[in-house]
Design a protein with these regions (language model features):
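Glycine-rich phosphate-binding loops of nucleotide-dependent enzymes
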Residues: 1-234
Length: 234
């Protein structure tokens, strides 16, 4: 509802809030999956209105979705095919109209190892993986400079939901590395610990509006943040 904020380069901006207060709609609009009725989303001064969803995902942002089974992976195919959608135009992986399968398998095996995906090989079906390893496949595709050109914005929507502490720690570390490399990171989470641990600054969504903004999280407490999330403070 008329929200306005900026994600700066080299910053993790956390979006806190009880679920159902506009987070899903916000993410859908930023990623181009929901059309904008009014206003705009610009990434490095480029309006997403001028881009297709594919162009947004290829050129402007990486996206780790909350629902990895619906939006993050194709569970009925192998790890390799889930890692390569951004590589289909690269000449080093093409032979005319055909893809170089051996080169892609080698890359996928190496990236899976880099991201500590526990699997037999990149030919294993994603649907056979644990939730944590499935999330690592999503992270490898979206966050590795070997599988894509890293865009200026990373959108991480509940990135640790339903995964073990090892996978959570791994993905958190990757987000921090990308922030330190100069990317802007938009972190949406209902987990107060995750928000406070990772975010440099925080906005709170309540009833579709920004109820609080904290430019520096170093002195922000769970209690204070929770009051804004519940609408006690605005």
């Amino acid at each position: 509802n008329h929200v306005n904020f900026t994600v700066r380069k080299g910053e993790i901006l956390g979006v806190a809030g009880v679920e159902g207060n506009g987070q899903a709609e916000l993410v859908s609009m930023i990623t181009g999956m929901m059309p904008l009725d009014q206003g705009d989303v610009t990434i490095e001064d480029i309006s997403i209105k001028e881009k297709t969803i594919r162009q947004i995902r290829t050129e402007l942002l990486s996206y780790i979705p909350q629902d990895r089974l619906t939006y993050g992976v194709v569970s009925g195919t192998d790890i390799r095919n889930n890692l390569i959608p951004f590589l289909t135009e690269r000449k080093e992986y093409r032979n005319g109209i055909l893809m170089k399968t051996k080169a892609l398998k080698k890359l996928a095996d190496e990236v899976a190892k880099d991201y500590s995906v526990k699997c037999d090989s990149s030919e294993q079906y994603v649907g056979m993986l644990s939730g944590g390893n499935m999330q690592k496949v999503v992270a490898a595709r979206e966050l590795s400079d070997r599988t894509r050109k890293i865009p200026p914005l990373i959108v991480a929507d509940q990135p640790s939901r339903g995964i073990d502490i090892g996978a959570t720690t791994f993905i958190h570390r990757k987000l921090l590395e990308l922030r330190d490399a100069g990317c802007g990171v938009l972190l949406i989470s209902a987990d107060l610990n995750e928000i406070l641990e990772l975010s440099d600054s925080v906005i709170v969504l309540y009833d579709g509006e920004i109820s609080g903004y904290f430019p520096d999280t170093r002195k922000l407490t769970e209690r204070e943040l929770g009051q804004y999330m519940l609408g006690v403070k605005r």
